[in-house]
C-alpha cells in the first residue's frame, strides 16, 4: 500500500514496505550522503549512485526548466507523470513482476498540482548493461522479448527499450527507466517495433495499435515532405 506523508515542504510517497527510505531522503535534505558516482549532472537533472545504510541506491533530482506552462496544464488534465509511474511500479511489483527496477520513494515540491522539483530514490541493479555486451544471442533476445511482453500484460510500457535500458544480472533481464504513460495499444506497438529495430526481434502482433502507429508515422512523413523536410 502506498503511503503519503509530508516532510518539510515536500509531499512524499513510499510503499509501506519501504518506509526506511525516508531516512535516506532526510540524509539527502541534510546534505549527508555519500556519492559514489555521478551519472548525469545538467541544469535540470542530477542522477547519482549513493551509498547508504540500505546498500547502493540511485538518487535522481529533476527540476523541470522548459515547457513549464505546458507541464502545468498537463498536470491539471492528466495528473502527474512520476506519481503515475510510482503507482504503476508498486502495482506491477505487487502482482509479482520483478523484472522492472523498484521505485522506493518519490518526493515532490509543488504548487497545486504542478511539481517544481522531484526527488526519486530508485533500486540500483549491479549488473551488465546491454549496451556493454557486443553480442546478443537468441536466448537473450527471447528473454528481452518476454520481459517486455510481461510488462505489457501487467499494464505498463517501456517507452524506449534501447540497449541502455536493460541490465543483465545473474543471467536474468532487468528493465530500467520505464515510462509512466498509459499503456495504450499504440505505445505497446511502439515497444514491439523498437525491439525489432534495436535487436531484430520480429514483431508478430499487428493489431489496431500497430496499424494506427504506422499510419501516424506515414502521415507525419507526408507532412514533412510537403514542408521540404526529409522523412524520418
From Swiss-Prot:
Protein's UniProt keywords contain Plastid: no
Gene Ontology biological-process annotations: carbohydrate phosphorylation; lipopolysaccharide core region biosynthetic process
Phenotype of the disrupted gene, per the record: Inactivation of the gene leads to decreased susceptibility to human cathelicidin LL-37, an antimicrobial peptide that acts by damaging bacterial membranes. The decreased susceptibility to LL-37 derives from an altered capacity of the peptide to bind to the bacterial surface and a diminished capacity to lyse membranes. The susceptibility of the mutant to other cationic helical cathelicidins is unaffected.
Pfam families: WaaY
Catalytic activity: alpha-D-Glc-(1->3)-[L-alpha-D-Hep-(1->7)]-L-alpha-D-Hep-(1->3)-4-O-PO3(2-)-L-alpha-D-Hep-(1->5)-[alpha-Kdo-(2->4)]-alpha-Kdo-(2->6)-lipid A + ATP = alpha-D-Glc-(1->3)-[L-alpha-D-Hep-(1->7)]-4-O-PO3(2-)-L-alpha-D-Hep-(1->3)-4-O-PO3(2-)-L-alpha-D-Hep-(1->5)-[alpha-Kdo-(2->4)]-alpha-Kdo-(2->6)-lipid A + ADP + H(+)
UniProt keyword Cell inner membrane, yes or no: no
Enzyme nomenclature, EC number: 2.7.1.-
InterPro entries: Kinase-like_dom_sf (IPR011009), LipoPS_heptP_kinase (IPR009330)
One Gene Ontology CC term in the entry: plasma membrane
Pathway in which the depicted protein is active: Bacterial outer membrane biogenesis; LPS core biosynthesis
Alphabetized UniProt keyword annotations: ATP-binding, Kinase, Lipopolysaccharide biosynthesis, Nucleotide-binding, Transferase
Any one GO molecular function term: kinase activity
Similarity annotation: Belongs to the protein kinase superfamily. RfaY/WaaY family.
NCBIfam families, per database record: PRK10359.1 (NF007684)
Purpose: Kinase involved in the biosynthesis of the core oligosaccharide region of lipopolysaccharide (LPS). Catalyzes the phosphorylation of the second heptose unit (HepII) of the inner core.
Protein name: Lipopolysaccharide core heptose(II) kinase WaaY
Amino acid at each position: 500500500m502506498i503511503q503519503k506523508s509530508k516532510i518539510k515542504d515536500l509531499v512524499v510517497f513510499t510503499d509501506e514496505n519501504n518506509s526506511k527510505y525516508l531516512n535516506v531522503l532526510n540524509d539527502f535534505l541534510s546534505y549527508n550522503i555519500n556519492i559514489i558516482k555521478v551519472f548525469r549532472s545538467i541544469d535540470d537533472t542530477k542522477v547519482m549512485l549513493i551509498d547508504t545504510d540500505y546498500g547502493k541506491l540511485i538518487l535522481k533530482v529533476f527540476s523541470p526548466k522548459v515547457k513549464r506552462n505546458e507541464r502545468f496544464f498537463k498536470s491539471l488534465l492528466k495528473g502527474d507523470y512520476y506519481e503515475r509511474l510510482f503507482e504503476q511500479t508498486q502495482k506491477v511489483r505487487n502482482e509479482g513482476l520483478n523484472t522492472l527496477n523498484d521505485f522506493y520513494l518519490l518526493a515532490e515540491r509543488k504548487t497545486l498540482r504542478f511539481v517544481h522539483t522531484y526527488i526519486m530514490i530508485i533500486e540500483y541493479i549491479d549488473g551488465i548493461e546491454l549496451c556493454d555486451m557486443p553480442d546478443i544471442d537468441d536466448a537473450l533476445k527471447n528473454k528481452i522479448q518476454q520481459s517486455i511482453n510481461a510488462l505489457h500484460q501487467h499494464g505498463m510500457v517501456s517507452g524506449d527499450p534501447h540497449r541502455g535500458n536493460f541490465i543483465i544480472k545473474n543471467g536474468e533481464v532487468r528493465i530500467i527507466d520505464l515510462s509512466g504513460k498509459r499503456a495504450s495499444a499504440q505505445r505497446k506497438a511502439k515497444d514491439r517495433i523498437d525491439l525489432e529495430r534495436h535487436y531484430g526481434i520480429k514483431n508478430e502482433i499487428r493489431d489496431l495499435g500497430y496499424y494506427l502507429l504506422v499510419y501516424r508515422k506515414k502521415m507525419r512523413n507526408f507532412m514533412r515532405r510537403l514542408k521540404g523536410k526529409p522523412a524520418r
